[in-house]
Amino acid sequence: MADLTPVQVLPADIGILNFANIGSDSLAECNRLLDKNHRDHHMFVRDTAGHNHIVHAVLAVLALGGSPQELRDRYDDGASMQRPLPPCDAELLEKLNDPEVFMATLSERAQYTTFLTFFERKMAERGWRSVLQEYLFARTPLADAMLGRLYEGAYHALIHLGYGIEFQSPAIIAEALGQAASHDDSGIAQLFRSAEEEAVFQYPTPRGTPLIELVHEVRANDQIRTAPRWSDYGNKMRDGIVGRACEPMSTLASQFQIFPNEADLERRTAEMIGVCAYMSGAAQRPGRKRKIDFFHMHALNSALFFTVLIRQQWIRLEDRVRMVERKARLDLAWYAVAGSAALDATAITDYSSPESDGLGWDELFAAVNKEHDDGHAAKFIRALKNGEMVSRRYEQGEWAEFFPMKGDMWLKLARMCQDTTKGMPSDLKWIPFTGFEQPWKRADLAEAGETNTAEKVRLY
């Protein structure tokens, strides 16, 4: 694969959100592992759902101060399930400059390598920022299609792009664009378009509508809350929210709007991060052990990268605003997809465990780096620390009602994450669809004396 660009994270680009000293030996091992993944592995581990998380896992652990051995361990955790890169279609590659051909090829997973090579060549010609401007932010039919797909698959391509921009890696950015182009379509772009059309007729108050208020409105709306059905399984977004409730969902979501200035963008980005964290910890079920929702976890893990994105001054303000508005609107849709669980702040504020009560952030970073995991837990704890940092200035005073996460709730939720994922097999670390009763029947979530079984759901 001569066209593949080497992955080379430089010492000056080790992430704007790193919370630990990163050694040169760890950085060298990170580059070796990421380059091997780039050259050897498909972005998708199977034909439906299933994403390659190696980049996410390795870079999250690196940013938290991981050793070379910990980086190798996280690579090995994911390597066994990967598929080889599909072949590059040389004939198609030469035709992708035609927007009609490009659009007609979208969603073809077998063409991931073709898309990857296409974007690498484009970046070699004129740089990754220029390529992102054309293929995400140009407001053309092709760019709008790609931007919508960036949010598909529980935010995975978005997370990948976030890592690429944070660590200034053209190869990882090309992977993200290739993933977005070849990903299946659940109709999220339709939801975005409808919400943006509705937003034109909204008249936001000077302070805007709190996102957490809109979360509660989702649960109170019978048409939205009942649209996803358990029998939809992994298609609750496509068949449930987009299929059965697109109009009421987009109308409600359109109420989240950001005024076109840097101050409001910064505040509402922090607000979005806090609401994602709050949903993750507060969506519990009385009488069952605590467990964090798989999809709320992804909402928070992707939210971290909007701290990165809103600082990219080479992206026009209106495009940065659009990206954050879409993220918050999609978070509302995913809350509905997950079953609109009742949210209880005391699940976070009252959290206590003898295993973790004494752990601070540094101890949690060190502990999660040692866990056999595909990177989800390390990303989650890192995202919580970032959320604590960017939200602190807004948690009290005039914006307090917009920020449900306050003070030590961030650290308590990080401890909850560590306690409920450590030593667990991957399929038991999280719980999907917390608003439905079925997943809570898992035997490992039963209190003493109870025995239940739950249907397994294939996750992303």
Curated annotation (Swiss-Prot):
GO terms for molecular function: oxidoreductase activity. Disruption phenotype: Leads to total loss of monodictyphenone and agnestin biosynthesis and accumulates emodin and chrysophanol. Pathway: Secondary metabolite biosynthesis. The lineage of its organism: Eukaryota, Fungi, Dikarya, Ascomycota, Pezizomycotina. Keywords: Oxidoreductase. It holds the Pfam family Questin_oxidase. It is an enzyme of class 1 (oxidoreductase). Belongs to the questin oxidase family. InterPro entries: Questin_oxidase-like. Its cofactor is NADPH. This is Baeyer-Villiger oxidase AgnL3. Its EC number is 1.-.-.-. Baeyer-Villiger oxidase; part of the gene cluster that mediates the biosynthesis of agnestins, dihydroxy-xanthone metabolites. The pathway begins with the assembly and cyclization of atrochrysone thioester by the non-reducing polyketide synthase Agnpks1. The atrochrysone carboxyl ACP thioesterase AgnL7 then breaks the thioester bond and releases the atrochrysone carboxylic acid as the first enzyme-free intermediate. The keyword Nucleotide-binding does not apply.
